[in-house]
């Protein structure tokens, strides 16, 4: 299965609580933090919810 490299590109200041929780569930903390996750429907759904805050690359 493919892996996704997810980078938090925008700050969470002023963002609604559900978006903050989604970013936290992805394992991202500060701006420009990077995580590598398996590509599955659950992760894709979370990325869709915060697509305006993150940058995604396939590894």
Swiss-Prot record:
Gene3D superfamilies: Ribosomal protein L30, ferredoxin-like fold domain. GO terms for molecular function: structural constituent of ribosome. Keywords: Ribonucleoprotein, Ribosomal protein. Pfam families: Ribosomal_L30 (PF00327). The keyword Protein transport does not apply. PROSITE patterns: RIBOSOMAL_L30. One of its GO terms (cellular component) is cytosolic large ribosomal subunit. The keyword Ribosomal protein applies. SUPFAM superfamilies: Ribosomal protein L30p/L7e. GO terms for biological process: translation. PANTHER family: LARGE RIBOSOMAL SUBUNIT PROTEIN UL30M, MITOCHONDRIAL RIBOSOMAL PROTEIN L30. Belongs to the universal ribosomal protein uL30 family. Part of the 50S ribosomal subunit. This is Large ribosomal subunit protein uL30.
